[in-house]
Amino acid sequence: MTIWVDADACPNVIKEILYRAAERMQMPLVLVANQSLRVPPSRFIRTLRVAAGFDVADNEIVRQCEAGDLVITADIPLAAEAIEKGAAAINPRGERYTPATIRERLTMRDFMDTLRASGIQTGGPDSLSQRDRQAFAAELEKWWLEVQRSRGQM
């Protein structure tokens, strides 16, 4: 079981939460990016550098993730592919993607892409708030408790 991070777009405050969680959970954490990353020394944390290019990091995460893994990403198509493989997916704001919600999210993403392509300014997401950080940490903890229950450790 591994936590995979779409690290190029992941906010540093979320990475910090993940570093601490990897140590506490003693769970492998892999940050996938197309640039060098500095991470704290740990036997649980590693980086995987991929070539620059559209969706290269996403494709590598999809290739390597397995059922039971966790993928941290704001990229909806990546989350959809991870869910298809049986992994869980959480975005940096603490929202868990599920098979029930991912189709709706993909449809909304495609709609927003169409608006942008037609010249309509849609704006980006708000900056990450303290509430978002707390929601992320809470959802990560919830996922970890589910893992422990499934292993019979609770």
From Swiss-Prot:
Gene label: yaiI
NCBIfam families tied to this protein: PRK00124.1
Transmembrane segment boundaries: none
Lineage: Bacteria, Pseudomonadati, Pseudomonadota, Gammaproteobacteria, Enterobacterales
Protein's organism: Escherichia coli (strain ATCC 8739 / DSM 1576 / NBRC 3972 / NCIMB 8545 / WDCM 00012 / Crooks)
One protein family per Pfam: DUF188
Name of the molecule in the record: UPF0178 protein YaiI
Similarity comment text for this entry: Belongs to the UPF0178 family.
